[in-house]
Amino acid sequence: MNNSEIWVDNSDHGDWMVEFIPCKKGQNFSRDNLLDLISCWNKKIDEEAYEILMAVILQPKEKSEEYDFLWQLELWTKDRDIFWTEWRNNHENSWNEDFGSIATFLTDEIFDFKVYLRGELKPLDESNYHQEFKYCSLKKDHNLSEVLDFENNYQNLISTKKIKGSTLTAFLKPLSDHKLNNFDLIWHSCYEDLDALDESSKIIDEGLSSIFDIHSTQHVGKRIR
């Protein structure tokens, strides 16, 4: 077994990718102002006919020095660079003038990834759910392909033990040289509630601890497009 077996596209949805834009709250940030910003952003995306497949706001469960929230986008891979070139050239300055006092989008620090789905996709209330990222660094004398045996066992365990488990499991592979490119694997999961997250997260940590050094971050997600 080799590492190429990790990066197998199991999606039937075409060639898509995900990225996370760090955002900082401005002096005029409030819940109502954020809702207004979201509404204006969606209107702008529609007016310009940009094909954004999905957008989500992620609030970190623990305070981050790097961002106050993440703005997650899913796009067709072929459209991604075109979108950002047009946005930066034609819209970013005016957007920042209008909305920079509410939130600053750190578009020079985007984390972009190709998503490799694992296991079964399950229904999810996208208005309020949980995402977890496990950042995995290989221990000495271990190979990345070892994760596949555990991942298969994990999916079987979820099924046979009637554990609620994740609604989505994926391996994320960086598409550019950002700072999260230093990890050997990012294990990404979505969960319906905290009980499901806590139960599955412990199983994953126990199963991967012999292969990787791991640290995790958790966020509350809300779909906005």
Regions found by a protein language model. Give the residues of each.
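Short S/T/G/P-rich N-terminal loop/turn motif that feeds into the first structured element of a domain
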Residues: M1-R225
